[in-house]
């Protein structure tokens, strides 16, 4: 497990792969992420990947306009991501997958320089309480 970084395109693109407890790993990051690909299987097979806490961490770490895509098309995932600020849509899937989800964060929460991570997280606590994915 752990964090695995791959630099591409003369180091102008940074790909960060996370292997482990997703909410804990995201909670330890400070970043401004432009694009997400969530490959965590369907909520029925990997429920830890699709929690309100994970959605809140994704929103906290996202830059304004951040794009997000995932193979799952589950309504609970779509609604959970929408509750933390993503505009999500069902799209045509890939291969045998009929539908998938894609979207973007309308506007990232701005924080003053030096703001502690715990204070940053509190901005999403209200959304976290509303979210009820399976």
What are these regions (language model features)?
Residues 15-17, 31-40:
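Short SAM/SAH-binding signature in class I
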Residues 35-37, 64-72:
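Conserved beta-strand signature within the Rossmann-like core of class I S-adenosyl-L-methionine
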Residues 44-45:
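Short glycine-rich, flexible loops that bind phosphorylated cofactors or substrates
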């Amino acid at each position: 497990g752990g964090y695995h970084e791959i630099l591409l395109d003369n180091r102008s693109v940074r790909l960060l792969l996370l292997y482990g407890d997703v909410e804990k790993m995201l909670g330890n990051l400070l970043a401004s992420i432009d694009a997400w690909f969530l490959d965590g299987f369907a909520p029925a097979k990997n429920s830890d990947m699709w929690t309100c806490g994970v959605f809140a961490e994704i929103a906290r770490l996202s830059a304004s306009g951040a794009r997000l895509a995932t193979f799952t098309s589950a309504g609970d995932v779509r609604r959970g991501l929408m509750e933390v600020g993503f505009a999500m849509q069902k799209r045509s899937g890939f291969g045998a997958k009929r539908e998938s989800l894609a979207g973007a964060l309308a506007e990232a929460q701005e924080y003053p320089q030096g703001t502690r991570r715990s204070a940053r997280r509190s901005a999403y606590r209200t959304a976290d309480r509303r979210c009820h994915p399976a």
